């Protein structure tokens, strides 16, 4: 393991976050800390993960897409952000691609993703 990867692994361990195993096609609920003036609250953002970037490094991120009031909304979250309160996998999707950018041009039934019923957690 090279020096940079070793430093990143130490930083990830220092954060102490537990990131669930999720991939493109999964529906996730991200609890994001929002600060409004002096108050801080957790806002949930639920949608389909259309891509992950950066593997499991400290700079990794993932893109979540949802339909809000008939408009497609995408948001990119840094995986190890201090503003992320929680990541919860709502359902597992069965897809054959790592990046689901084709969902941007689809609406309704053609944008559906089949659910995985026989998912097994990865043991580490």
Swiss-Prot record:
It comes from Cereibacter sphaeroides (strain ATCC 17023 / DSM 158 / JCM 6121 / CCUG 31486 / LMG 2827 / NBRC 12203 / NCIMB 8253 / ATH 2.4.1.). This is Large ribosomal subunit protein bL19. The keyword Disulfide bond does not apply. The keyword Ribonucleoprotein applies. Belongs to the bacterial ribosomal protein bL19 family. The gene is rplS. One of its GO terms (biological process) is translation. PANTHER family: LARGE RIBOSOMAL SUBUNIT PROTEIN BL19M, RIBOSOMAL PROTEIN L19. This protein is located at the 30S-50S ribosomal subunit interface and may play a role in the structure and function of the aminoacyl-tRNA binding site.
